[in-house]
Amino acid sequence: MLMAGLRGDYSNEHGFFVTPRAHLKYNPNEYVHFRLSAGKGYRTNHVLAENNYLLSSSRKVEIAKGLDMEEAWNYGASVSTYVPVFGKTLNINAEYYYTDFLKQVVVDMDSNPHEVAFYNLDGRSYSHVFQVEASYPFFKGFTLTGAYRLTDAQTTYKGQRMEKPLTSKYKGLLTASYQTPLGIWQFDATLQLNGGGRMPSPYELADGQLSWERRYGSFEQLSAQITRYFRRWSVYIGGENLTNF
């Protein structure tokens, strides 16, 4: 099945622009589903609202005049499979997405370690994201889900293409959920693995040491919740960051 669309918008700030989009779905049988998508996207960047966490730092904020509306091509592909295993269904889903920016507002924390600058992209900026997810009900009421994601995000900072800072190269997720036969109690646990990534470029202190490490390492976070259901309401108790990161 093919579905295509064309949308037109007018902005008093950016004028008229057209957004094309296309989706393709193919099911060779009841167990396998393929999907493809492609299209263009536009977005107005509100630099202070979207990056307000930087205002609490000691960095000076520099915002260039005439920031463009962001413009990018997006491409995606996914395959979903439903595999019968011991009388139950194992769900496996794999996805890949590629975003290629034609225009982008760059958040530059590398050119000057004491400053954060916002300016229009001059060069390439893109991201590749691949994710695979699997879910299986081992027995009645108990489901285990696992997911893993790889990310490659690159942006050009004043002529130099670099890995986007503060972006984990990979992430993993494992969730377990169990509901008692009468549906009165439910137990949930989630373990998340956050991979390492690049820090903004550091500066050298008076003693020759770097202000911070160039990269940060991976870390895990665990959360859990217990829920008690009643006829018209429910109550729960839970904890986050139980690994104390």
Predicted regions, residues:
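Residue-level signature of outer-membrane beta-barrel architecture
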Residues: 16, 26, 40, 69, ...
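Transmembrane beta-barrel strands of outer-membrane/channel proteins
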Residues: 4-8, 36-40, 92-98, 146-150, ...
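C-terminal beta-signal and adjacent terminal beta-strands/loops
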Residues: 42, 193-204, 226-245
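Surface-exposed extracellular loop regions of Gram-negative outer-membrane beta-barrel proteins
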Residues: 1-12, 17-21, 136-152
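Gram-negative outer-membrane beta-barrel transporters
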Residues: 96-100, 120-203
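Residues that define the transmembrane beta-barrel architecture of outer-membrane proteins
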Residues: 16-18, 71-75, 98, 124-128, ...
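Membrane-embedded beta-barrel scaffold of Gram-negative outer-membrane proteins
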Residues: 27, 33-35, 68-120, 124-126
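Repeated loop/turn-to-beta-strand initiation elements of outer-membrane beta-barrel proteins
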Residues: 1-2, 31-34, 85-92, 141-144, ...
